[in-house]
């Protein structure tokens, strides 16, 4: 169908039937009546218009882009020491650091209570209530130095035992000395305990280990 014939048909100067017949004869892409295209072909045309792939290839890849899977992004990162790991401990090791009444010096104890020492027979009593005052009196009467530990007693009973021990020491010409808080030393008359020895007993905490 010539271009002139098409123009004539457009303005009504040629029969329309001829125009339509010639038009459909020239268009090879139109399928015959009753023909149905496969579903796969129709889906591809709808999802991917013609020329899509060509236009997509016109865009350049970003500079520095590396194709494939970037494993480096998922590798474990090495972490440096955290802040609290670098912080030095506020307290040193506890082993060997005990001082005062809680410390136990074996050498000092050996010298203080060695055989022949006035304190070699020393004993420690921890009464629970005032009813144990008799035991304290008997040990002291027999000439044994007594450490009286009243820490576990209530203040009322502890005060009564202190008064009892002080009167006992006075009656038997002994001595009654405070070693630590609620801890007292009863010494018979023939046992002379110096202030230095009492201090060493308190610092070594000897009464806590008997």
UniProtKB/Swiss-Prot annotation:
It holds the Pfam family SepF. Keywords: Cell cycle, Cell division, Cytoplasm, Septation. Its main location: cytoplasm. Residues 37-60, 79-88 have a biased composition (Basic and acidic residues). InterPro entries: Cell_div_SepF, Cell_div_SepF/SepF-rel, SepF-like_sf. It is found in: Cytoplasm. The keyword Cytoplasm applies. Belongs to the SepF family. It comes from Mycolicibacterium vanbaalenii (strain DSM 7251 / JCM 13017 / BCRC 16820 / KCTC 9966 / NRRL B-24157 / PYR-1) (Mycobacterium vanbaalenii). Homodimer. Interacts with FtsZ. GO terms for biological process: division septum assembly; FtsZ-dependent cytokinesis. HAMAP family: SepF (MF_01197). Gene3D superfamilies: SepF-like protein. Cell division protein that is part of the divisome complex and is recruited early to the Z-ring. Probably stimulates Z-ring formation, perhaps through the cross-linking of FtsZ protofilaments. Its function overlaps with FtsA. Residues 22-72, 79-98 are annotated as: Disordered. One of its GO terms (cellular component) is cytoplasm. This is Cell division protein SepF.
């Amino acid at each position: 169908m010539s271009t002139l014939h098409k123009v004539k048909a457009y303005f009504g100067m040629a029969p329309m039937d001829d125009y339509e017949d010639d038009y459909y004869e020239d268009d090879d892409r139109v399928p015959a009546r009753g023909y149905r295209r496969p579903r796969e072909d129709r889906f591809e045309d709808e999802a991917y218009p013609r020329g899509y792939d060509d236009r997509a290839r016109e865009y350049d890849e970003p500079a520095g882009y590396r194709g494939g899977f970037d494993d480096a992004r998922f590798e474990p990162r090495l972490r440096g020491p955290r802040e609290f790991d670098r912080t030095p401990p506020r307290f040193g090791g506890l082993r060997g650091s005990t001082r005062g009444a809680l410390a136990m010096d074996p050498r000092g104890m050996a010298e203080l209570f060695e055989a022949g020492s006035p304190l070699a027979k020393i004993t420690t009593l921890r009464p629970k209530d005032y009813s144990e005052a008799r035991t304290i009196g008997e040990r002291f009467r027999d000439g044994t130095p007594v450490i009286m530990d009243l820490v576990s007693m209530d203040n009322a009973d502890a005060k009564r035992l202190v008064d009892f021990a002080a009167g006992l020491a006075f009656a038997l010409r002994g001595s009654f000395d405070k070693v630590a808080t609620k801890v007292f030393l009863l010494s018979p008359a023939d046992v002379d305990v110096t202030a230095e020895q009492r201090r060493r007993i308190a610092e070594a905490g000897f009464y806590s280990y008997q």
